[in-house]
């Protein structure tokens, strides 16, 4: 989405990513190469920013949740049937009603972390409600709204809730959404959130925007590298 210039902060020329990303660019680069949150070009398109990959983590990965094991077993046999979870963001009673309709026809359901920065129940509570309603829950978690301590707490709570997987996204900048008054965090990004989800025994997934510049496979490669089992 291209942001009208009037809604952007008139900052100094861009010399660092507004999302504090290391493994950029994100999927929000506009078709003309400009940053989603700044009129200047994305810094990852202007120059190579070499990234040193850390050594593979040696921390033992705990056993997956029961729902994650079930999803892995399904994937070993056939294609997974997954759908979105169209419940209102702050209405707990919607969850059981939607689950009653979807559960007989789908293997899992994705409840995303709002890209538009609207207020909604936190990921772990959504995961708890969906699991209690009989759904295999795949829960979106963005790095925009929480620092790494809060994110690690959410992942621990998601494991405790028994969700199947975590959809890890960096998140759209708050300048582009419904709450431009909210300060973005971006202490982590999708690429650094993925291994943390995996380390909690959760199946991780990520989003990719193939139409966003620079039209290369680097984002896909980097996300896959961090999300797969060692």
Show the residue positions of the predicted features.
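Catalytic alpha/beta active-site cores
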Residues: 100, 106-108, 112-115, 131-132
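Alpha-helix-loop-beta-strand connector modules within alpha/beta enzyme cores
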Residues: 117-140, 184-206
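Metallocofactor- and cofactor-centric catalytic cores in central/energy metabolism, strongly enriched
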Residues: 1-73, 78-92, 112, 117-123
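Structural motif corresponding to the early beta-alpha repeats
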Residues: 131, 135-151, 157
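Short catalytic-loop micro-motif centered on adjacent basic/acidic residues
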Residues: 110-111, 138-141, 230
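Short, ordered loop/turn segments at secondary-structure junctions
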Residues: 31, 86, 113-115, 142-144, ...
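Alpha/beta enzyme core
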Residues: 68-82, 90-108, 148, 152-230
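Generic signal for short, ordered secondary-structure residues
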Residues: 4-5, 81, 109, 130, ...
């Amino acid at each position: 989405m291209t942001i009208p210039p009037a809604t952007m902060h008139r900052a100094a020329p861009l010399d660092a990513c507004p999302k504090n990303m290391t493994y950029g660019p994100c999927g929000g680069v506009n078709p003309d190469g400009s940053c989603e949150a700044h009129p200047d070009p994305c810094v990852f398109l202007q120059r190579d920013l070499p990234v040193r990959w850390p050594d593979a983590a040696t921390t033992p990965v705990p056993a997956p949740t029961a729902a994650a094991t079930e999803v892995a077993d399904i994937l070993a046999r056939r294609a997974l049937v997954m759908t979105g979870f169209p419940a209102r963001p702050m209405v707990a009673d919607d969850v059981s009603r939607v689950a009653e309709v979807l559960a007989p026809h789908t293997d899992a359901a994705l409840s995303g972390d709002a890209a538009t920065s609207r207020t909604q129940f936190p990921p772990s509570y959504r995961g708890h409600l969906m699991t209690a309603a009989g759904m295999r829950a795949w829960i979106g978690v963005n790095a925009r709204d929480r620092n790494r301590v809060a994110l690690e707490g959410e992942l621990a709570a998601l494991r405790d809730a028994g969700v199947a997987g975590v959809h890890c996204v960096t998140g759209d900048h708050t300048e582009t959404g419904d709450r431009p008054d909210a300060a973005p965090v971006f202490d982590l990004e999708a690429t650094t959130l993925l291994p943390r989800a995996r380390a909690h025994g959760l199946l991780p997934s990520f989003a990719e925007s193939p139409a966003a510049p620079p039209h290369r496979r680097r984002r896909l490669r980097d996300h896959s590298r961090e999300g797969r089992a060692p």
